[in-house]
């Protein structure tokens, strides 16, 4: 056992040192930092002792306008210096100075939808899912629902340094997304999950609205970022099958993975719901058992609204296990499932399954490695954050590691100083105590218990997750991006003298885009983004660091029996 742990740690350490040396510039370009949606941030400043003394940066302004469900992004390498990108339900997009929190540029894409939707629990609806940035072209991609005579989803591309709309964008999803004769209907489709950029194609996943109203489907739309008129899509055959999780589309770098929810009126014939779906570039889908997995009781899950797709897909590797390349799903049925991502298996038993207690929905999970092994972690509706170990065996098994009570409904994220050491699991008590919390990745011992008066946030929204860059944590909330700092954070880099040239031409922005109803997407004319003068905020008192909480003893987790699911859980 000791030799296997040593081999694992040496391999992992070499891997992460290569990663760190190749990425001296820090950029957080997407949901949960990586395509795998593991939520892992490598930052040498985040030792347990430093994390215990995290404080809010009261000199960081962070003022924005609108409700926030999306994770902020962190972008370096441009003429403005390090930037925070934030998007809101008011269809506002912001670039903020990463040190001061003042506005560098701001765009409004048009009115959000405030009424006329058949159901839902987000109001207004504008930009919900976390954007993605292509560093090579310095382009920012996101989906916005814009009100008008016809309510429509548009996929946008902006120059991340100026806010100008790139040529050929936005893409009218109503007009361009089709699959096997089915057409996209924005009125009943919600876009919650983070966008993914894989090999030059940006992927956007869609669900329905809370309440399961209207003839919605689970959709994945792919747009070629160098030729936005080239649009492909996949959708569930049956109505329903929404892709609900905050992580949206996950990828192993080649294939894309999504998890779908319950479908309707199938007559017992599987039509894409309650499943892990593997999509190839485009997206395209073979329909073969290698490219989908659904549990043998999928029809029962359909009938009781206990979606397999409560949490977005997470790609997970388990060194020493057979199979070792897996994908994780966490459902509203209280279960965790692991399947072989190279051969999903069709309607079949999973590689591993465990009852993990509590309904899991709307969030993202995390995965991480320590010297002790491989873990995944998540927050559930029962008010607990938990971690499970995945054994390096044939086949792998799922074993409870720790579970802690935590008031909120956020998606966790993970920091580590080098990839395997000093692993800390973080979560915000969104729609709960509205504070940050941190736990030892191996034991669950409390490292940070929310701080003092200054560390209280307000207006945090369900499912949301934080982001880490250069010794800081950033978190988006209603009308505000919050910044938290360690006692000795990594200095923020200065601006790059010359901006990287974009791969595509940009249009000269003028007036606010008006959604169009034509069948061909066109480049819209947009307002000239002006840099807001950077005004130094009024200095405020430096917060007193909170005392480091005494770590708690590793809890003993009692396995929970699987209860009968409620007939229709109220909130997705």
Describe each region flagged by the PLM:
Residues 1-5:
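Positively charged n-region of N-terminal signal peptides that target proteins for export
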Residues 13-23:
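C-terminal segment of classical bacterial N-terminal signal peptides
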Residues 25-319, 324-346, 359-369, 374-388, ...:
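Mobile, glycine-rich extracellular loop/lid and propeptide segments
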Residues 348-359, 398-403, 452:
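Inter-blade linker and blade-boundary elements of WD-repeat/beta-propeller domains
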Residues 384-407:
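Flexible internal linker/loop segments at domain or repeat junctions
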Residues 488-570:
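Ser/Thr-rich, Proline-interspersed low-complexity disordered segments
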